[in-house]
Amino acid sequence: MVMRPISNKGLIYRHNICLRCNSTLAVSNHEPITQKTRNFLETTTTSTAIFQCNSQISKHARNGNLQEAEAIFRQMSNRSIVSWIAMISAYAENGKMSKAWQVFDEMPVRVTTSYNAMITAMIKNKCDLGKAYELFCDIPEKNAVSYATMITGFVRAGRFDEAEFLYAETPVKFRDSVASNVLLSGYLRAGKWNEAVRVFQGMAVKEVVSCSSMVHGYCKMGRIVDARSLFDRMTERNVITWTAMIDGYFKAGFFEDGFGLFLRMRQEGDVKVNSNTLAVMFKACRDFVRYREGSQIHGLVSRMPLEFDLFLGNSLMSMYSKLGYMGEAKAVFGVMKNKDSVSWNSLITGLVQRKQISEAYELFEKMPGKDMVSWTDMIKGFSGKGEISKCVELFGMMPEKDNITWTAMISAFVSNGYYEEALCWFHKMLQKEVCPNSYTFSSVLSATASLADLIEGLQIHGRVVKMNIVNDLSVQNSLVSMYCKCGNTNDAYKIFSCISEPNIVSYNTMISGYSYNGFGKKALKLFSMLESSGKEPNGVTFLALLSACVHVGYVDLGWKYFKSMKSSYNIEPGPDHYACMVDLLGRSGLLDDASNLISTMPCKPHSGVWGSLLSASKTHLRVDLAELAAKKLIELEPDSATPYVVLSQLYSIIGKNRDCDRIMNIKKSKRIKKDPGSSWIILKGEVHNFLAGDESQLNLEEIGFTLKMIRKEMELI
């Protein structure tokens, strides 16, 4: 020891933990320590030396600065047990397990905490559990932490049998609450509910940590009543308990109960809310679309002595973005001192979803460290605007691409009608050895369905089977749609019947497929199956049903379904439903009923409604209604040739040639041209598009021969 006078009131000892100031401080094979560390070692006094050195070792280790931590440790002439443990932990935190073992072996004296620290280090670094258990067995005097640490290792590795065995071997005085809580939490995380309940019920002492874990567990099991019963029986609750119960209500769909409990938590005031509680509240307000409550809680935050940290800011901004209040979202973003990729992406995603693409792109260009999410969001944004070239440009600029970005690009082509390009990009994706996911297959199956390309669809189906995702519901629904649109309802129904739990989309797709392929009776039969399943039909279901009634001419049944929409299912019929009914009545010759139905529509009839009436009026030679329908169509679609052509044809049929010429002259004077009909045919795996009267195709003779064969087959049906 070196004594140094400090004042005339006394002396203190300076701990001799460093070498001479003018010498180079080196640590075995390490670089010389920094001047900052040298200064620290020289100014440490005897009363605080070991404690401060231990703290500095831990601090440097957390920051990844092992060199400084080692320097302090090696230059300490006196070390406590905590010093050795701090150095073991420092190496373990930075993945240097061989060095940790070296320090452990060098320890002059090993106590229980030394063994516990080494076992903890091994578990954190996922070392051999067998060796960890051997070390555990070598502990002369095990304590509660020893047992809990080893049980933690078994639980994290999913070795619950060994965890249970060790728990049973744990002395009763060491079980509660540390070891019990470790096993309880492990079972809850693994979803082993019955085992968790057994451990909890077997605990002699149930303190706040174990009870809070069990409240959370009951909520995850869906046993909200049990969770609340335990919550109410607790004599002590912490913020974790309150937050778990509130979140449990929200996840079970009980917003009012969760919000009410939050208010009670605030009123009682014994436990203060924290960032996690508020994040749960903001998420619930977002998911339940409760802007008013969310903004009220935001107001509370500004009055709370609570740090507006990154986590809280992101939660609040996500709520505003998802609810569409972009002004508030931008305001929160503006006041956030720190921002991460979640912050930037949350605002960009919100702007994209609200079609504010220019503003989203401006923010995207400012974003530091753009990631997959931000790139993909912008591709989706420009896809929604129909700017496919910009999507391709962004895709090319991406430093890295994964299956999500490839899928976004393929979906962009599909949603904008570029089906062949979508398939081309899908094959490029496969060539790049990027593995498609279920969303990729749903998109490309949609493309093949739109092209009615059964051969390509079959190949994609085969790849789906090979990749073992044929049981994915979205893929199954896409396969049903593809086969239906390719005219193969038999295979479509085979896929449908293999769906273990079909949803309303599954039923709608199959019913619609039967309907537009002319199998109206099968569509109606499938609807009966839907009703028996207990699932609720929606507007799309009834559109397919009414279309089926049109194909089979079931007027009375069509009326029944149409009226039941409102009376039985509280679904308000839309313009498309009215158009189907007008078509059904018109084809059956009930044109006055069709006209009366249009006059009772609660919404403005669209072109589909008037088009159905015009077509039926021509068929049944009702000039008065045809003229009315044509007039309305011209008002809605002034550039469409359809009303002029159909009305002129009707005049020609009934011998009103002057009116026929008059209508066609009006059409010519307005320079309205009828778009030629377009068709496509697949020959030898290649799609050939052509217009009516088009003779520019190289395979004209082969196309003509194929069309004749199709016509002959149709005549045999």
UniProtKB/Swiss-Prot annotation:
GO molecular function: RNA binding
Entry-linked InterPro entries: E_motif, Pentatricopeptide_rpt, PPR_At4g14850-like_plant, TPR-like_helical_dom_sf
Location of the region described as Type E(+) motif in the Swiss-Prot/TrEMBL record: 685-715
Major subcellular location class: mitochondrion
Pfam family of the protein (one): E_motif
Localization per Swiss-Prot or TrEMBL: Mitochondrion
Annotated Gene Ontology cellular component terms: mitochondrion
Transit peptide endpoints, chain numbering: 1-47
Any single biological process term in GO: RNA modification
SUPFAM superfamilies: TPR-like
Keywords: Mitochondrion, Repeat, Transit peptide
Keyword Transit peptide: yes
Sequence ranges of the PPR repeats: 49-79, 80-110, 111-142, 143-173, 176-206, 207-241, 242-272, 274-308, 309-339, 340-374, 375-401, 402-436, 437-471, 472-502, 503-537, 538-568, 574-604
Region Type E motif, annotated ranges: 609-684
Family that this chain belongs to: Belongs to the PPR family. PCMP-E subfamily.
Name of this chain's protein: Pentatricopeptide repeat-containing protein At1g53600, mitochondrial
Gene name for this UniProt entry: PCMP-E63
